[in-house]
């Protein structure tokens, strides 16, 4: 019986290489060499990195740095097969359908799931429309081809593992995948998927900025390695995974992964406290002319906005969930002050149109359900509103990236007679609160407060 297994990762970015690949590397280094990573991308916008990694045999150096400036260097060797991008993604599809592949994991960002506030597919999205016609521009079109081939080849069961910052990420992906297959008339694949796959929920955490320009020189000086594709991240790392794998899995708990019955308490704390605060700080910092997360966090007025949001609204909403939330808040905000990873506001500010409904709107809604006006939380969408107003005017200091940005709709919003009303009444962002008169009044107050902050 073959006991060599492949973990296929789709989305070969810095985060995967600083997080999941690090854990698999530690597992291999411990003497468990049954697993290896094969990795590739759906898009061809990172082929330079893939080619550099291929030339290095998949090896690269990870630099980690603490808030105190302590740096460590580790050569990561778990990625042992690089899948070059081709139109049609045949190398990726073949690897996914290989019987040795037992886990397919993916990091395609929050916007890469194309889900609306009701967790249904945004079928009007051009990439999704292309995939519904048989192309492979999204995770759904790509995995549909893999699952179809795996079914035809009788390649056996496997686990589909979402590693993105999406609430209930395994379930959301599963439902989106099934809806996609329904829309393409692939009932046989749906049946096969139900019998042969699971989609565990996960929570991932390690701040991973874009590699600094001087990183290769630092690695050469400190580790003596010429590396054309290094990555960097903070020292802190966490991975919580629902123990619901369909077939064999790596012994992840041996290297510090928390295998649990339910990920929900961890993901709620992380998404609301870390992810939402991170974006809040990036939007606010940008608006007052700052470039980096650490300098934005260390600005008293911005720190206070994030701290109030968590303390006054998030912690009461989450209640006693088994996690020490005040301590978690303090640890998160301390991590954001790390000046050595040089994390940019540009990176963290991205994908706001996915983040508001996923990370911020639930706290707004739950505050109203508790009979509390969400004064502190409302500052977050107000910051994003003014941030996007600067985008509309062309005065942002960098290019804003958003996988589901409808540029025409945003320009029309700011050209309307009452832009704040258009924003607050957007069901895609705020769900049922779009019909709440007090929420509109609150947004007017907070947008005015943001103007005061930046002027």
Swiss-Prot record:
Signal peptide start-end: none
Class in the EC hierarchy, top level: oxidoreductase
Enzyme Commission numbers on file: 1.1.1.11
UniProt KW keywords: NAD, Oxidoreductase
InterPro entries reported in the protein's UniProt record: 6-PGluconate_DH-like_C_sf, 6PGD_dom2, DalD, Mannitol_DH, Mannitol_DH/Oxidoreductase, Mannitol_DH_C, Mannitol_DH_N, NAD(P)-bd_dom_sf
Reaction(s) the record says it catalyses: D-arabinitol + NAD(+) = D-xylulose + NADH + H(+)
GO molecular function, one term: D-arabinitol 4-dehydrogenase activity
Keyword Hydrolase: no
GO biological process: arabitol metabolic process; D-glucuronate catabolic process
Keyword Hydrolase (UniProt): no
Pathway in which the depicted protein is active: Carbohydrate metabolism; D-arabinitol metabolism
Annotated Pfam families: Mannitol_dh (PF01232), Mannitol_dh_C (PF08125)
Record text on subunit structure and interactions: Monomer.
Family as reported in the entry's similarity comment: Belongs to the mannitol dehydrogenase family.
Protein name as catalogued: D-arabinitol 4-dehydrogenase
The species this protein was found in: Klebsiella pneumoniae
Designated gene of the protein: dalD
